[in-house]
Amino acid sequence: MNSETLDVTGLKCPLPILRAKKALAQMQQGDVLTVLATDGGAPGDFEAFCRQTGHVLLDASEQDGVFTLVVQHK
């Protein structure tokens, strides 16, 4: 299982999701993508994205205005 980090801080919707989708397309089942985002809608966007695509949102947290979203490839 591999893990990668994607920094999309400063980007607004829909760019964080689009960049994550592109990164996940290069990953294998079970791999984990950690996304760093500052868009306030990111947690809800990633929850919906995972629900629609079958990926798993393992964790969503916020510290000092930066959201950390951990997504496992389906």
Swiss-Prot record:
<dbReference type="Pfam" id="PF01206">
    <property type="entry name" value="TusA"/>
</dbReference>
<feature type="active site" description="Cysteine persulfide intermediate">
    <location>
        <position position="13"/>
    </location>
</feature>
<protein>
    <recommendedName>
        <fullName>Putative sulfur carrier protein NMB0681</fullName>
    </recommendedName>
</protein>
<dbReference type="InterPro" id="IPR001455">
    <property type="entry name" value="TusA-like"/>
</dbReference>
<comment type="similarity">
    <text>Belongs to the sulfur carrier protein TusA family.</text>
</comment>
<dbReference type="InterPro" id="IPR036868">
    <property type="entry name" value="TusA-like_sf"/>
</dbReference>
